[in-house]
Amino acid sequence: MNICILINKDLNPNTYAFVYPILINFKNFEKLTIDIVFDIKEKNYDIILIDSKFFIKQFNDNNNQEIENKFKILKQKTKILVYCDNEASIFINKNIFKFIDYYLKGRIPADLNIYKKPLYGQRQFTEFYNKKYNIIDDNENYSHILNDHEISKIILGWNNGIADYSYLSFIRKNIYKFANIFIKTNKINFINKNKLFTARFKQNYNRNTINYHRNLYEKIFSKRCEINRISRFRYFNELKKSFFSVSPYGWGEICYRDFESFLYKCVLLKPDMSHINTWPNYYIGNKTYLPMPWDNLNDTFMEKIITNKENYIDIASEGNKNYLKYFDCNRNYYFLEHFNKIINKITE
């Protein structure tokens, strides 16, 4: 089977995370008799996968006509055209359904029927804060309503967790970008966890609903640790030393900080993730991370986890173990098996 994967050569961080598991498993694809290329040639392909950032310039310029023309050209070169994104679980580019056969998403709602409702702010948690606390965004928007046919095209892909989130990741990414030389992640050397929290998440968004969520966490954690942004070097040094790592929602539910926390063997403190379905499933409540409430986060809750912090050591270990197992491609074929299920689904 011949598969072409189209990405933006500027290698946006999400794009790099999209192709990373393919690159570390590249030789293993021979087991599936799959040939993968990243440049479209004159020949036709069984499947073409298009990363959403492939059209980033056209999306930014609102050049819908050029996007439509490209989709039509690509459709002539393949039996199956698949659009892929790693955006928030509810966000869907509804306008491209008419051009594609399948829509691959790195995270989807646990209940797909949610796609049939207009959600405030295009996220389940922004809908929650709007409805319960009447938080209003300056520029209000709602998620698109999808019909059953459109929902049937949505398939769970893979999130951006299988990638390099170490301190030197930006160097290795640029080596691949400019020299096409791929270097796999180095092992992390752990040091004593002599700091209680790392919570460097202070940031303002142009969405009141998102800011409301983050401010809830800011009020609690600013009493216990510094939350202002610091240099990359200082941040990673702090991460190595920290027992707990705090990662609230941002533009989406899944954040790079989640994977950095798993990699550096912290106990990930994160808002409850049970509302989404994602692969790999890093978010197993009270086993790989410690879920926190979307509201009613209070000092009593915090004092409980601080007082009993030794009870959570296993969560840090399990989160780290569960995260790293997807990188051992010589003994484990998790990504290969998941990729094969996707291929079987779209070709059945």
Could you tell me what each predicted segment is?
Residues 2-38, 42-256, 269-285, 330:
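Nucleotide-sugar donor-binding catalytic core of glycosyltransferases
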Residues 229-347:
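Catalytic binding pocket for nucleotide-activated donors in carbohydrate/polymer assembly enzymes
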